[in-house]
Amino acid sequence: MNQSILSPFGQSEERAIAAINAFKQGNGVLVLDDEDRENEGDLIFPAETITVEQMTMLIRYGSGIVCLCLSDEICQQLDLPPMVTENTSVNKTAFTVTIEAAKGVSTGVSATDRVTTIRAAVADNAKPSDLSRPGHIFPLRAMTGGVLKRRGHTEASVDLARLAGYKAAGVICEITNDDGSMARAPEIVTFAQKFGFPVVTIEDLVAYRQKYDV
């Protein structure tokens, strides 16, 4: 990653701390992965505090595929099996079956309905029967060990939530440009400065976790 483009957001550790602090306040963070991986930026919010306004932003500026990243423990609690028996995707993105809240939603597509579904999934004592399958929220199972084991947005979102004191659950969506193409680092920086989001790389989070053993 070209560090100079990220200089407005500080050095690596400063970016990691700013991202964790933003999460603690229920605010969003833009996370960039490695250039030789997806080379994309995701807007991520803590699942426990997601609002309709934040969901609307994800839908408006993102790819439309809003994902709920969950620890393996939560996936087991909710009985969310893998979407497929054999995962042949390039980055082994661990989609589970899709979900909808069993109560309180209409079609499940609106920002309000999607927030209702996420709240049902991350509620205290949530159980499998609280969710219908399939639905319009795409859960992703994070690898145990987080970004230290897999340098993906899924693991980054769960790590950020955990480091901020939340349940291991984050809501993510890839940011796209106006022409529908994927936003890369330069566009992510512009987007972040326009809306006031911190930017952090997965490399930053790996370094922070390794330094502080967290």
UniProtKB/Swiss-Prot annotation:
Gene3D superfamilies: DHBP synthase (3.90.870.10)
Required cofactor(s): Mg(2+); Mn(2+)
Record InterPro entries: DHBP_synth_RibB-like_a/b_dom, DHBP_synthase_RibB
Molecular function, one GO term: 3,4-dihydroxy-2-butanone-4-phosphate synthase activity
Annotated EC: 4.1.99.12
Keyword terms of this UniProt record: Lyase, Magnesium, Manganese, Metal-binding, Riboflavin biosynthesis
Pathway: Cofactor biosynthesis; riboflavin biosynthesis; 2-hydroxy-3-oxobutyl phosphate from D-ribulose 5-phosphate: step 1/1
Record bears the keyword Metal-binding: yes
Binding site for D-ribulose 5-phosphate: R37, E38, D42, R150, R151, G152, H153, T154, E174
Binding site for Mg(2+) 2: E38, H153
UniProt-listed Pfam families: DHBP_synthase (PF00926)
GO annotation (BP), single: riboflavin biosynthetic process
Stated role: Catalyzes the conversion of D-ribulose 5-phosphate to formate and 3,4-dihydroxy-2-butanone 4-phosphate.
Family: Belongs to the DHBP synthase family.
Subunit and interaction comment: Homodimer.
The name this protein goes by in its record: 3,4-dihydroxy-2-butanone 4-phosphate synthase
